Amino acid sequence: MPGPSPGLRRALLGLWAALGLGLFGLSAVSQEPFWADLQPRVAFVERGGSLWLNCSTNCPRPERGGLETSLRRNGTQRGLRWLARQLVDIREPETQPVCFFRCARRTLQARGLIRTFQRPDRVELMPLPPWQPVGENFTLSCRVPGAGPRASLTLTLLRGAQELIRRSFAGEPPRARGAVLTATVLARREDHGANFSCRAELDLRPHGLGLFENSSAPRELRTFSLSPDAPRLAAPRLLEVGSERPVSCTLDGLFPASEARVYLALGDQNLSPDVTLEGDAFVATATATASAEQEGARQLVCNVTLGGENRETRENVTIYSFPAPLLTLSEPSVSEGQMVTVTCAAGAQALVTLEGVPAAVPGQPAQLQLNATENDDRRSFFCDATLDVDGETLIKNRSAELRVLYAPRLDDSDCPRSWTWPEGPEQTLRCEARGNPEPSVHCARSDGGAVLALGLLGPVTRALSGTYRCKAANDQGEAVKDVTLTVEYAPALDSVGCPERITWLEGTEASLSCVAHGVPPPDVICVRSGELGAVIEGLLRVAREHAGTYRCEATNPRGSAAKNVAVTVEYGPRFEEPSCPSNWTWVEGSGRLFSCEVDGKPQPSVKCVGSGGATEGVLLPLAPPDPSPRAPRIPRVLAPGIYVCNATNRHGSVAKTVVVSAESPPEMDESTCPSHQTWLEGAEASALACAARGRPSPGVRCSREGIPWPEQQRVSREDAGTYHCVATNAHGTDSRTVTVGVEYRPVVAELAASPPGGVRPGGNFTLTCRAEAWPPAQISWRAPPGALNIGLSSNNSTLSVAGAMGSHGGEYECAATNAHGRHARRITVRVAGPWLWVAVGGAAGGAALLAAGAGLAFYVQSTACKKGEYNVQEAESSGEAVCLNGAGGGAGGAAGAEGGPEAAGGAAESPAEGEVFAIQLTSA
């Protein structure tokens, strides 16, 4: 047996829940009222579906119970206080089943509500019109039969994916089923080809079910627009049998033009047109061909159909038959003098005209007779035929040519007696004769020579010139004529008749003549270049101004030729003062040579040779007339004197005397203007020792920074510096830079002690000596006797003592010495302190040490000081770091108790006879 259905399981679950609640209620409150319950109270069931209903009560022992409904039952299950029943094939839109129980002589009831729903399985969009005019309304109608409930239904009309209208049916009665939605829509161009559809939505989500959707099949809308105007026909009004003429039909304002159908016919003949679309217009073209069966009045029809509507145009076309006239000659070719008959005939309705003369009546032929002459050869005869068709006059014509046979004729127009051709270009030589048949023409020289190639393209040469006999012949006879051929050509100037170069001699008679070749004979004119209108004619007395270039031009009708003729006039040598001066000055180093240019043609050769004195037989170098890479070497020295210059060419010679002098530009060097000069301060100053060589004698000026050197002054240190000296004469300048140094005697500018206060025993002090001198001075010191452990700086400018003792007190002298003198200054150093008694107590020991120091000092003075240097370490260990004078120095023991270093007596010049030795310290 199959298990219970899901609905039954839900009903049983509800029943057990109700029983449990009932038992709990009985145990908790025995006085609670009894009730009946129906589950589910409200249910939505798809139409035709089934449902389990559970009916239960809390009555402990109900007497009886049941479920009242009009729906079909399929099965029932019972318990003490419950009843479950399955309802099937539920189709009613809405039913209310009743659950009841009898308990304690009371009837307990519970009512339920069962509603059915039907999916929108059928969604129908009513058919659209086959064609819908643009700008007019059409109806969209959508039906959804049976779907419901209607209150949960929504219908939407769509154009493609675009919603046009959407409607819901909320508020409709619960039992209402099915729906219809209708809308009026304006047809537009863009709706053509659009798909319209309807979408139905049954929304049961508020009732715990889903959303059911369905759409109709799409329906395509076709819109159209057709102009109210009739088509335009373009066709001939008349159409000849057997002819083809184009016809066309045009209509604007069509949409869609591609859907239009065009019918084009002539009578009952369909023309099957070719249709061309141009936007909202079309052009239908076809070719109409008329046949004899269609002769008469016919209609040309153009019919346009679109969207079930049509537009039509009709026009009348007359089809006619009009053959061309017939023109005949009795003889198409006759001999001169024979009679010829010309006849023109046409159809029965046509009127013919022959050579402008009409026939008497339509349908009758026209005739003409003539006696054939030469002038009638190739004569054309014209026949016209006219026919009236539908009020219009039609014309056709025909022509025929008559040939007349006659003997040849050579006319001057076709074969001139005199021919003149230009030489060179290719020509077609023509001598034509009239005659029928066409005559043959032959031209040859009378002497049996050259033959002219008539009718052929060929070059024209001078050899063709001459007289020719031309003969024309055909089967009717012959003709003879003599012709003369002249070949013309442009002038030519050759070297024989007109040489390129002509030489004349000054003072003789000559003429300038040029002979040119050409046909016709050319005229020759010679004009000097650059002189308009100066034509050279006849004999000339040759002068130099006749030399130059002449333009000779030969001219005839065939052209011109021109040639330049260079005329040279030669003459003997002649000196001119500007080009060969009588006096010349040579400047040494200028690189110039004597220029002696001589006038003459051809160019004379020139040689200058010394005459007398030191220049006897000496050849004077000359500058070449034209610069050349192989110019003569320029001499470094040129002997001045008198030279004789001779100029010679083939027309003579001439001599001239030249006086040559020599000069030179300024020159300064180390010997005449030393680059370094030294002055002594205070001396009388004179000009700088600068001189220059040169001719004429140069002047020399010296300046510093543009300021000239004063004539007289005393030399001071400010005069030291750099001077610029310039030497000048007529041939140039030379300059040198001179450095002036000013030397002066030494002066001890500063002698100072540090510290400036008192020096206590055991303390340190330093003496500084600064001297001004040039060249730099040598510094020397003189210290008190017995002063030990004295240190000097490398240049002796500083004297220092570490651990001063009483022996360091006394007078110190600083002396500065250079080549120009000596200068000295003195300073007194005092050493004192509270331990003076110690010094007194050790006086005896000091005396002994002093004696030993004096001996050592004498040794140092006699050895190291006289050499000018000694070792610093040795000097310090010996206790003597200074050089003493010959007397052994001054006393150094008298230092005051409160004293300190001080200058004693300021600067004092050392006696000339005193000897002070300089001390140079060197590293050990």
From Swiss-Prot:
- Natural source organism: Homo sapiens (Human)
**Where are glycans found on this sequence?**
N54, N74, N137, N195, N214, N303, N316, N371, N397, N583, N646, N764, N795, N796
One annotated GO biological process = regulation of synapse assembly
Q: Which SMART domains match?
A: IG, IGc2
**Which gene is transcribed and translated to give this protein?**
ICAM5
Q: What is this protein called?
A: Intercellular adhesion molecule 5
Enumerate the CDD domains for this protein. Answer: IgC2_2_ICAM-1_like (cd05755)
Q: Which family does it belong to?
A: Belongs to the immunoglobulin superfamily. ICAM family.
Query: What is known about what this protein does?
Result: ICAM proteins are ligands for the leukocyte adhesion protein LFA-1 (integrin alpha-L/beta-2).
Compositional bias (Gly residues): 891-903
Q: Which residues carry this modification: Phosphothreonine?
A: T182, T184
Q: Which Pfam families does the annotation name? A: ICAM1_3_5_D2, ICAM_N, Ig_3
Q: Which InterPro entries match?
A: ICAM, ICAM1_3_5_D2, ICAM_N, ICAM_VCAM, ICAM_VCAM_N, Ig-like_dom, Ig-like_dom_sf, Ig-like_fold
Q: Where is this region: Disordered?
A: 891-911
Q: Where in the cell is it found?
A: Membrane
